[in-house]
C-alpha cells in the first residue's frame, strides 16, 4: 500500500469493519510513536461504534496532550493487504487542530508484521 507524505506526516487509507459495515478512512496517520491505534469518534459513529456503559474508559497521553477514550473491538482492520481480525482500538475526540480520522499505532503495526519502506513510501 502506498503511503502519502503530507506536512511531514505519513498518511494511509484504512478499512474498518464492524458488524458487517465497512468504513474507508483516508486521513489516517501511521504513528510508530503511539502504542495504541486510535480513531475519531465522529468517524466511527458512522459504523454504530458509540460509547456504551460497559466500555472501558481511560485517559491517553501523547505529545499533543491527553484525552479520554473508550475501547472497542473491530471485526477487521486493514491497510491494504495488512489485516487483523477482532482488533481492539481506542476511540476519542481527536481534536488536534488538523484533519485526522485516526492513528495506526505500534499495536497494529507489530501484530500485522508491517514493514514501512520510507524510500518508496510503501507499507506491506
Describe each region flagged by the PLM.
Residues 1-124:
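Pepsin/retropepsin-fold aspartyl endopeptidases
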Amino acid at each position: 500500500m502506498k503511503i502519502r507524505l503530507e506536512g511531514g506526516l505519513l498518511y494511509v487509507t484504512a478499512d474498518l469493519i464492524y458488524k458487517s459495515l465497512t468504513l474507508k478512512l483516508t486521513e489516517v496517520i501511521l504513528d510508530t510513536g503511539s502504542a495504541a491505534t486510535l480513531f475519531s469518534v465522529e468517524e466511527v459513529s458512522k459504523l454504530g461504534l458509540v460509547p456504551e456503559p460497559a466500555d472501558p474508559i481511560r485517559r491517553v497521553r501523547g505529545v499533543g496532550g491527553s484525552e479520554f477514550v473508550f475501547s472497542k473491538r473491530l471485526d477487521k482492520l486493514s491497510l491494504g493487504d495488512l489485516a487483523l481480525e477482532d482488533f481492539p482500538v481506542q476511540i476519542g475526540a481527536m481534536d488536534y487542530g488538523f484533519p485526522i480520522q485516526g492513528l495506526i499505532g505500534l499495536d497494529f503495526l507489530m501484530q500485522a508484521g508491517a514493514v514501512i519502506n520510507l524510500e518508496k513510501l510503501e507499507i506491506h
